[in-house]
From Swiss-Prot:
Known partners and oligomeric status: Homodimer.
Protein's name in the database: Uncharacterized aminotransferase SSO0104
Modified residues annotated as N6-(pyridoxal phosphate)lysine in this record: 242
InterPro entries with a match to the protein in the record: Aminotransferase_I/II_large, Class-I_PLP-dep_aminotransf, PyrdxlP-dep_Trfase, PyrdxlP-dep_Trfase_major, PyrdxlP-dep_Trfase_small
Family, similarity comment: Belongs to the class-I pyridoxal-phosphate-dependent aminotransferase family.
């Protein structure tokens, strides 16, 4: 009934394929490798309970009250301290903005910056929720292939030059340089610096999504691109969903003070501010060292699960498949033989009791028909083995028909 009343922008909104998949698996004997949920055993439950009790006993008048749109000042100062652990310096609370998870940050930033027809560079593949948020702005996507080392920077320069030769500048590049979702790839430090040089040379902004920056479990996590930013060209976002608890719905943005003011104006007209109680809980979790002390456990749990998944893939996937070997994050991305369409194969996989996310959702042009994203952070180890076995059987059956 209401479709004829909807705005044009609303009609561009797309449902989350991942959440649709999770609905399909509810109440069924299906091992879901589809979601991106943290492992609940990594949640510091008792510590959060103690913090919440202390806050409600001593600071309820503030924690349950309205607060500043950009976030509680004390909390933003703690976020400056937390960001130093990722190598970001030379900032203060005026460069920090608190959001309802990094998802709100994505939506706000794309709406603040993008007009219809703007050239936006994205990785291929990239985070599907970011693509969906951008689509409402109707940009022109320029897709850059993700290699084992991250986005192909030679291809990036070539495509930017092509755009310039046609009189079209690039406005923004959205990039996930560390433990990329979905590909699991991590850019090295030199490539990060080179990307920043390219952005400066061709005068575009970089939107850096560092959701998994703290979750590198093999080797050192490279500093974010923001750590090398001298021009204020990088807009950086991260989240507490992966390092504390997703139910708090907390993220943050680090950017030039002028852009933070634009975010403040936008959020005032959307939801006033991010929930105060969640901010107080996260602030105390930083102050008491709970987040910092819990990171080794999170990394250990995810490394063990990644190893289990990779071993199972080696055992059960066909020889002509290939997949990433992530050094952090939550996901493995796989490329199957070209004859397989993973969207069409999904129903058969569900019948065998396993779910994954078809890879075409992660491409701006919906290519990648033979790809899939599989998650290792949430399922139990035995579920990972059995789930990959079921998935391998499905793939082999598909190849034989």
């Amino acid at each position: 009934m209401f479709e004829r009343f909807l705005s044009t922008e609303t009609k561009y909104l797309r449902t989350s394929e991942i959440r649709d998949l999770l609905k399909l698996t509810e109440g069924k004997n299906v091992i879901s490798l589809a979601g991106g949920l943290p492992d609940p055993q990594t949640f510091p439950v008792e510590e959060i309970k103690k913090i919440a009790d202390d806050i409600l006993l001593n600071s309820a008048d503030k924690a349950l009250q309205y607060t500043a749109t950009a976030g509680i000042s004390e909390f933003r100062r703690e976020l400056v301290n937390l960001s130093r652990l990722r190598g970001i310096s030379g900032i203060d609370e005026r460069n920090v903005f608190v959001t309802v998870g990094s998802q709100e940050a994505l939506f706000m930033i794309f709406n603040i910056l993008l007009d219809p027809g703007d050239n936006v560079v994205v990785e291929a593949p990239t985070y599907l929720a970011a693509l969906n948020a951008m689509r409402t702005r109707k940009p022109n996507f320029i897709s850059i292939t993700v290699t084992e080392m991250g986005p192909d920077l030679d291809e990036l320069e070539r495509k930017i030059k092509d755009a310039h030769s046609n009189g079209k500048k690039v406005k923004l590049m959205y990039v996930i340089p560390t433990a990329q979702n979905p590909a699991g790839t991590t850019m090295n430090t030199e490539d990060r610096k080179r990307l920043l040089e390219i952005a400066s040379k061709y005068d575009f902004l970089i939107f850096e999504d560092d959701a998994y920056g703290f979750l590198v479990f093999e080797g050192e996590s490279p500093p974010p691109i923001k750590a090398f930013d001298k021009e204020g060209r990088v807009i950086y976002t991260s989240t507490f969903s992966k390092i504390l608890a997703p139910g708090l719905r907390l993220g943050w943005v680090i950017a030039h003070e002028d852009f933070i003011k634009e975010m403040e104006l936008y959020k005032q007209n959307v939801d006033l501010h991010t929930p105060s109680l969640s901010q107080y809980i996260a602030m105390e979790a930083i102050r008491r060292g709970i987040i910092q002390n819990n990171l080794p456990k999170i990394r250990r749990v995810y490394k063990e699960k990644r190893d289990v998944m990779l071993e199972a893939i080696e055992t059960y996937f066909p020889n002509d498949a290939r997949w990433t070997k992530p050094v952090g994050g939550m996901f493995v991305f796989a490329w199957l033989p070209q004859k397989i369409d993973t969207t069409k194969m999904l129903e058969k996989a569900l019948q065998r009791g396993v779910a994954y996310v078809p890879g075409s959702s992660f491409y701006a042009d919906y290519s990648g028909k033979n790809t899939m994203r599989i998650n290792f952070s949430f399922p139990k180890k035995e579920e990972l083995i059995e789930g990959i076995k079921r998935l391998g059987d499905t793939i082999k059956h598909e190849l034989s028909t």
